[in-house]
Amino acid sequence: NRFLLSPVLAGEMTVQDIILNDWDWYRDNNITLHTGKKIVKIDRKARKVFADDGTEAEYDRLLLATGSNPFILPVPGKDLPGVIAYRDIADTDAMIEAAATRKHAVVIGAGLLGLEAANGLALRGMQVTVVHLAPWIMERQLDKPSADMLQASLEKKGLAFLLEKQTESLIAGADGRVSAVRFKS
C-alpha cells in the first residue's frame, strides 16, 4: 500500500502493518498472484500472458496494473549511490538504511511526497534540508499564506528549507556516494 509508505518511513508502522492481503488471502480467493514478473506478451485470443522468464498464465479476466515511475531530476549525479527515489517499499527501506548510517539528507522537492519523506527522515534522526524550485512549498496545493504556516510548523520540527533553488548537479564524495548538491546561480 503505497499511501502508507510514509508511516513506515517515519517508524510509525511496519511493512507488515501496511500489507493489504497476505499470501493466504490470494490462495483462499482462487487468485494466482505472480509477483516480480515482467510481462512481455499478451495473447488476447488465447487469453494468455507471457513473462520474460518464460512464465505463462491463462486468464478469464486480465487486470493490467502497470504502476508508475518516480520523476528523477535529469542532472549529472542522479545515478550516484545514495540518490534514492520515493515510490515503493524498496525505496523506503533504502531511506531507512540511510537514516541509520548517515546524518544529513537533502530532499529535492517540497510537494506532498517530498515533505513526507523529509518528515520521516527527520523522525529517524537525520538533519534534513528540503530544496524546492518554487517560491513556496506545495505551491500546487496551497496558497502562500497556508504554505508559510506549514513551513513554519515543519521548521519547528527541525526541517530546513532552501526555496527558489534549481539543482544543477549532485556531487560525489570521496567514497563515491552523493555528498553535495550544486545549484544553478
PLM features per residue range, with description:
Residues E116-A117:
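Hydrolases whose catalytic domains are alpha/beta-hydrolase-1, hotdog thioesterase
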Residues L33-F50, A57, L123-S185:
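A Rossmann-like FAD-binding core segment of flavoenzymes
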Residues L5, L9, L73-V75, V83, ...:
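Short clusters of hydrophobic/aromatic residues that line enzyme substrate/ligand-binding pockets
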Residues N1-T32, G120-P145:
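Beta1-alpha1 glycine-rich phosphate/pyrophosphate-binding loop at the start
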Residues L113:
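Hydrophobic/small residue at the entry helix of a nucleotide-binding pocket
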Residues N21-V106, E164, A180-S185:
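FAD-binding core/adjacent interface of flavoenzyme oxidoreductases
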